[in-house]
From Swiss-Prot:
PROSITE patterns: SAICAR_SYNTHETASE_1 (PS01057). Keywords: ATP-binding, Ligase, Nucleotide-binding, Purine biosynthesis. This is Phosphoribosylaminoimidazole-succinocarboxamide synthase. One of its GO terms (biological process) is cobalamin biosynthetic process. It comes from Synechococcus sp. (strain CC9311). Pathway: Purine metabolism; IMP biosynthesis via de novo pathway; 5-amino-1-(5-phospho-D-ribosyl)imidazole-4-carboxamide from 5-amino-1-(5-phospho-D-ribosyl)imidazole-4-carboxylate: step 1/2. It comes from the Bacteria. The keyword ATP-binding applies. It holds the Pfam family SAICAR_synt. One of its GO terms (molecular function) is phosphoribosylaminoimidazolesuccinocarboxamide synthase activity. The gene is purC. It catalyses: 5-amino-1-(5-phospho-D-ribosyl)imidazole-4-carboxylate + L-aspartate + ATP = (2S)-2-[5-amino-1-(5-phospho-beta-D-ribosyl)imidazole-4-carboxamido]succinate + ADP + phosphate + 2 H(+). Its EC number is 6.3.2.6. NCBIfam families: purC.
Length: 250
């Protein structure tokens, strides 16, 4: 059984969300658009949507097997998936296992420093504001989530990290950092939403020492390194080789 596509509900930088014939579900189309720096840099990369969809499906199912709830229902095609409709929390959760990127620009922490335990940062999801960092006081002031919900969010995010880090390590990929979006479904259950892919994760090839060659994620696009699709394809190949074939939507 397939899901019937309805009207376009939302179009973001990397995905389109459509209504389906089930009120509690939506269809997600993964686009070939590549963006960086809050969409100030843009490009079309053939096959990017398919790769991110397939990687995300494999990783969502991996999390589910480990008891971590996600919004994923099943694949509709190679670049479409069906997911539960969720109320997305306007907070971006970032887990950092290795210091790089903005953390090193904003602090004296050296590039490549291992962070144990992982550093968890919360950001307010607003492109116009540049996704600012949320302190505890700002969270309270904005009244985005209750203290209990914040604890639930952070616990779930650390559980995701505890599953993904050793999984990627077994594939000779270092999970440097990643961002998560979470939301509540109709039953009030907190779910991992959005996607988990090289668009949302920094992944370094542990077989390579060169700081640029080892990058297998969106930084290849950000830094004009080239080989973006080849890098995403390599991640997809390793992930698919270590996980069951993702289920189709039924």
């Amino acid at each position: 059984m397939t899901s019937t596509r309805g009207s376009l509900l939302y179009e973001g930088k990397a995905k389109r969300i459509y209504a389906s014939n089930k009120e509690a579900e939506v269809l997600v189309e993964f686009k070939n658009d590549a963006t960086a720096f809050n969409a100030q840099k843009r490009a079309q990369l053939e096959d990017k949507g398919r790769l991110n969809c397939q990687i995300s499906a494999c990783l969502f199912e991996l999390l589910e097997r480990e008891g971590i709830p996600t919004h994923y229902c099943g694949l509709e095609s190679d670049h479409w998936m069906v997911v539960q409709r969720v109320k997305v929390i306007p907070i971006e959760v970032v887990l950092r296992n290795v210091a790089t990127g903005s953390l090193c620009r904003q602090t004296p922490i050296a590039q490549g420093t291992l962070l144990d335990p992982a550093l968890l940062d919360l950001y307010y999801k607003d492109d116009d504001l540049g996704d600012p960092l949320l302190t505890e006081s700002r969270l309270f002031l904005l009244d985005l989530v209750s203290p209990e919900s914040r604890q639930e969010i952070e616990t779930l995010a650390r559980q995701v990290n505890a599953v993904l880090t050793p999984f990627f390590s077994a594939l000779n990929l270092q999970l440097v950092d990643f961002k998560l979006e979470l939301g509540w479904n109709e039953a009030g259950e907190l779910l991992v939403a959005d996607e988990i892919s090289p668009d949302t994760c920094r992944l370094w090839d542990m077989n390579l020492r060169d700081e640029k060659e080892r990058i297998l994620d969106k930084d290849r696009f950000r830094q004009d390194l080239g080989g973006v699709i080849e890098a995403y394809g390599e991640v997809c190949k390793r992930v698919q080789g270590a996980t069951p074939k993702p289920r189709n939507y039924r």
